[in-house]
Amino acid sequence: MADLLWQKPGVAVDAKIQTFLAGDDVILDREFFLHDIAASAAHAQGLQHIGILSADELAGLLRELDVLAQDFRAGRFVLDTQYEDGHSAIEARLTERLGDAGRKIHTGRSRNDQILVATRLWLKEKLQRVAQLSAEVAKVALDRAQAEKDLPIPGYTHIQRAVVSSAGMWWAGWAEAFIDNAIRARDTHALVDANPLGTAAGYGVNLPLDREHTTAALGFARMQISPIYAQLSRGKFELAALEALGAATLDLRRIAWDLSLFTSAEFGFVALPAQYTTGSSIMPNKRNPDVIELMRATHASVAAARTEIEQLLSLPSGYHRDLQSSKGAIFHGFGRGLAALELLPSLLANLEWRDDKLRAAIDSGMYATDVAVEAAVAGVPFREAYKAAAAGADSAGQGRTPEGSLAARVSPGSAADLRLDELRARWQALS
């Protein structure tokens, strides 16, 4: 490993201790590395503004940072265990190429605010993708709700047949859910869109740093003013981002549950595209819905990441090395969550309803609620109407059709009044 930035003269660092301290840091920092480079460029510009760097030194630093980013993307520069972390790698590379100009890059900053700003940029990018994917899911659901608004399907409570419903209602429910998920991700993006660069180790520095410049250069909406709060927000903002992701994966889990049931032989309501199924290593007859089962499991990874960070945050104010462990949690949570959400729009667009199976699952008792409500409209107290309908539930469907039941469901949001135009307007407002 290269010399450590913090190593004191004459003090040897035990290799086992150093390996423990580093953990997976340098590997995890590959995710942040391009953001760390971008923040280093903005910081260098700020240092030139206050006279720490000359114009020539700044030009050299910006040139070498750009080359480093290109080399990293192309695989010519590998961030590996010869470096303590990504921050050390950047400084080592600049020092190797530029000498004293590279040694000046860390003036006025700490690795504490360096990782904060790189993480913040990474979280903004991931939250934008959560919002985009949620909007894509909502669009598919809205389009299918419109196309299949009159297709009868059985509605369930307690996984028991309840009332006649429609594919339009089912799709509209998911559309509204993912519109809300997109809004949640967008709102969380606004929360984390605050620049911590320039807060150093959490107490500021005795330099008039141009934080307004770095805020604008890195595309942040605002400066995070208090150095104390900058450190307090580490973990807190990651937690908020995971909660926004978790809102989407929670709905993903429930839609995957529906599809797990609907695709089973016992239900048979839905046919999945072949590319979303797998086979068995021993049973030649099997088509397993592995994709939706792994989608269903995704929320557990997101929830686990959130729990890990919550436990790490049992700390007093200021920076603590415990927070290093938050990086692996957010990488794993967002990695699993986004991978599953990426597949969802296409899956939903290509599933097929089996009309014959859907109609066969609508039995006479599923009209009993209609009978009770109709009697109440005619003047019978609802509780009496309910009891009468319950007694005659087995014959409630006589002379009735699923289409007739759906046409009578006129309460706002129900089958005969889906309010798809209102939902589409909400979806359009996302852009």
Swiss-Prot record:
<dbReference type="InterPro" id="IPR020557">
    <property type="entry name" value="Fumarate_lyase_CS"/>
</dbReference>
<protein>
    <recommendedName>
        <fullName>Argininosuccinate lyase</fullName>
        <ecNumber>4.3.2.1</ecNumber>
    </recommendedName>
</protein>
<dbReference type="GO" id="GO:0042450">
    <property type="term" value="P:arginine biosynthetic process via ornithine"/>
</dbReference>
<keyword id="KW-0963">Cytoplasm</keyword>
<dbReference type="InterPro" id="IPR000362">
    <property type="entry name" value="Fumarate_lyase_fam"/>
</dbReference>
<keyword id="KW-0055">Arginine biosynthesis</keyword>
<dbReference type="InterPro" id="IPR009049">
    <property type="entry name" value="Argininosuccinate_lyase"/>
</dbReference>
<dbReference type="GO" id="GO:0005829">
    <property type="term" value="C:cytosol"/>
</dbReference>
<comment type="similarity">
    <text>Belongs to the lyase 1 family. Argininosuccinate lyase subfamily.</text>
</comment>
<dbReference type="GO" id="GO:0006526">
    <property type="term" value="P:L-arginine biosynthetic process"/>
</dbReference>
<dbReference type="GO" id="GO:0004056">
    <property type="term" value="F:argininosuccinate lyase activity"/>
</dbReference>
<dbReference type="InterPro" id="IPR024083">
    <property type="entry name" value="Fumarase/histidase_N"/>
</dbReference>
<keyword id="KW-0028">Amino-acid biosynthesis</keyword>
<dbReference type="InterPro" id="IPR022761">
    <property type="entry name" value="Fumarate_lyase_N"/>
</dbReference>
<keyword id="KW-0456">Lyase</keyword>
<dbReference type="InterPro" id="IPR008948">
    <property type="entry name" value="L-Aspartase-like"/>
</dbReference>
<comment type="pathway">
    <text>Amino-acid biosynthesis; L-arginine biosynthesis; L-arginine from L-ornithine and carbamoyl phosphate: step 3/3.</text>
</comment>
<dbReference type="Pfam" id="PF00206">
    <property type="entry name" value="Lyase_1"/>
</dbReference>
